[in-house]
Amino acid sequence: MDKSIPIKAIPVACVRPDLVDDVTKNTSTIPTMVSPVLTNMPSATSPLLMVPPLRTIWPSNKEWYDGDAGPSSTGPIKREASDNTNDTAHNTFAPPPEMVIPLITIRPSDDSSNYSCDAGAGPSTGPVKRGRGRPKGSKNSTPTEPKKPKVYDPNSLKVTSRGNFDSEITEAETETGNQEIVDSVMMRFDAVRRRLCQINHPEDILTTASGNCTKMGVKTNTRRRIGAVPGIHVGDIFYYWGEMCLVGLHKSNYGGIDFFTAAESAVEGHAAMCVVTAGQYDGETEGLDTLIYSGQGGTDVYGNARDQEMKGGNLALEASVSKGNDVRVVRGVIHPHENNQKIYIYDGMYLVSKFWTVTGKSGFKEFRFKLVRKPNQPPAYAIWKTVENLRNHDLIDSRQGFILEDLSFGAELLRVPLVNEVDEDDKTIPEDFDYIPSQCHSGMMTHEFHFDRQSLGCQNCRHQPCMHQNCTCVQRNGDLLPYHNNILVCRKPLIYECGGSCPCPDHCPTRLVQTGLKLHLEVFKTRNCGWGLRSWDPIRAGTFICEFAGLRKTKEEVEEDDDYLFDTSKIYQRFRWNYEPELLLEDSWEQVSEFINLPTQVLISAKEKGNVGRFMNHSCSPNVFWQPIEYENRGDVYLLIGLFAMKHIPPMTELTYDYGVSCVERSEEDEVLLYKGKKTCLCGSVKCRGSFT
């Protein structure tokens, strides 16, 4: 945790002066990346928010299947024979997903003079009017007949025209983006994808999500360019080919070589812009800083082998040899835990040093191109190979700065190493605390939620996983499962998991946060903020990372110097993570609420007892958010705090979430918002507000 240093309040205008005029903006629409802050306690003003969304990515050809959603029920989309042997779009197969609709749709007033509490830092979408009768998802609802799942027309969710939809991305931002716009596009695409997974869309999910976003103007960096792409950083990862297309990293939907068209070449000159490796073609080899890339083509329309020709992408790569221009390289790798899932790693700028021809295994001519990585770039593919060796060869104790093999001492299913690469001679371990893998139940019972104990437990599931709408636990989640393949589908005011009275098995899809770590996490020493937490594994947006475990406290019990305190009453920066109904031709009132309004303040201290969650530091631009989880055990109801990935997170990236601030005030002189926290923030984000807690 960040070191505690008393500080003075910092005006918000010092951080983002452009935001001050937007305080009264209607937050029911989607900001590009800015929206007001939330808190439990009303205040006289409404603060601004400065939180980036998340990144998301996917592929766009016949093999566009969603690893989260499973294969299309209609089978692959046929396309014409390609000259491109480097078509690296991937297949991903998994069962179709489910998703969530909120039970508690408590939403703040549009009155900008009031703040509202946002547990995970989520925006309100305005009040939702409902007719009289039992609220949707009511705990005492007893359906008289089995519910039938809604059947969707595959064409009813496909956008044909933009209409009056405002993507809030200007023409200039569409052509040339920035970090904020790229994050927004990736987040919004993935939210649509998750929604399509939830309803088991019968056609290709990724193609539908991509097409809708493109037609509705949710895209950026459409101008083709040589060199760096604004808003995209070396080391960024993408789970789907088409994500790279939406944010302008790789514009070719099918080919592994992206190059200027004939018309563009007349202006820019013929050259290659980006290549994506597949790691599966003859003669293609990959070193940490070099790449031998196979040319494209080599088959006719019937799939028969033939000589590759010096045209298209091959001609562009040849031109880049003499031109000496930068070429972006994206490495396609197999997911470490899902053999049918690919991940794409942006590895930075390369130069095409030479090319030659060989006779391939088919007996026909093939081209080879050698690309060399430019120096002084952050490591990307090299980090992937390092953690791959750690996972596969168990080299923990031989690592630089190794201190302890397992900080949990066997309490977790996966070991939690402790390393200090900042000072290898310092073998000090974190201060004394008892490691607990999950929340201590004592004091965590949610007496505030008065459940009918006779209705607890999904008795009608009969020892089968909860997969149908007649399950009482599914009904509490709005008739849809909250997770799919261990991925959170929507943020909600509260998520209900199966508990002790439920006869469903331990592998039930609604039992996630209770079942412990599923990622290879490690605790490491940071340069400025003490101990931190990171993962060996790539993390997809929505992935459960860990629980924040500790002891439930009252205000009176909290110690002044407790740096390991989780507090739901803080003011959190808001961001939008759930999908926009308009991007799927749904009514705006169907928006799933992200506003969290717990009936009482929740304080959890991990100072004396805790798990890896206690080592997750604060950031004003976090990559993790928190979500309240409720479950029942032996007739009592308990509240847990789950920490989930906000966006795709590359391996060995520090995991951070927003700790919140104590209050936000408006200065009397110039109406500038002031964020007041007790500790100086050292997160280093461009949107750092200067303080926290």
UniProtKB/Swiss-Prot annotation:
Query: Where in or outside the cell?
Result: Nucleus; Chromosome, Centromere
Query: Which residues are noted in the entry as S-adenosyl-L-methionine-binding?
Result: 529-531, 562, 564, 614, 617-618
**Known EC number:** 2.1.1.-, 2.1.1.367
What are the transmembrane regions? none
- What are the boundaries of the region Disordered? 64-99, 111-175
Q: Which PROSITE patterns match?
A: POST_SET (PS50868), PRE_SET (PS50867), SAM_MT43_SUVAR39_2 (PS51575), SET (PS50280), YDG (PS51015)
**Xref: Pfam families:** Pre-SET (PF05033), SAD_SRA (PF02182), SET (PF00856)
Gene3D superfamilies tied to this protein: SET domain (2.170.270.10), SRA-YDG (2.30.280.10)
Q: Where is the signal peptide?
A: none
Chief place where the protein resides? nucleus
> What domain of life does the native source organism fall in?
Eukaryota
Q: Which residues bind Zn(2+) 1?
A: 458, 461, 466, 471
Q: What GO molecular-function term can you cite, just one?
A: zinc ion binding
Q: Where is the Post-SET domain?
A: 677-693
Positions bound to Zn(2+) 4? 620, 681, 683, 688
Q: Which reaction does it catalyse?
A: N(6)-methyl-L-lysyl(9)-[histone H3] + S-adenosyl-L-methionine = N(6),N(6)-dimethyl-L-lysyl(9)-[histone H3] + S-adenosyl-L-homocysteine + H(+); L-lysyl(9)-[histone H3] + S-adenosyl-L-methionine = N(6)-methyl-L-lysyl(9)-[histone H3] + S-adenosyl-L-homocysteine + H(+)
Q: Any idea where the YDG domain is? A: 227-373
SET domain location, by residue? Answer: 519-660
| DNA bind region | 129-141
Q: Which residues bind Zn(2+) 2?
A: 458, 473, 498, 502
Q: What is the annotated role of this protein in its UniProt record?
A: Histone methyltransferase. Methylates 'Lys-9' of histone H3. H3 'Lys-9' methylation represents a specific tag for epigenetic transcriptional repression.
Q: Give the record's family classification.
A: Belongs to the class V-like SAM-binding methyltransferase superfamily. Histone-lysine methyltransferase family. Suvar3-9 subfamily.
Q: What is known of its domains?
A: Although the SET domain contains the active site of enzymatic activity, both pre-SET and post-SET domains are required for methyltransferase activity.
- This protein is called Histone-lysine N-methyltransferase, H3 lysine-9 specific SUVH7
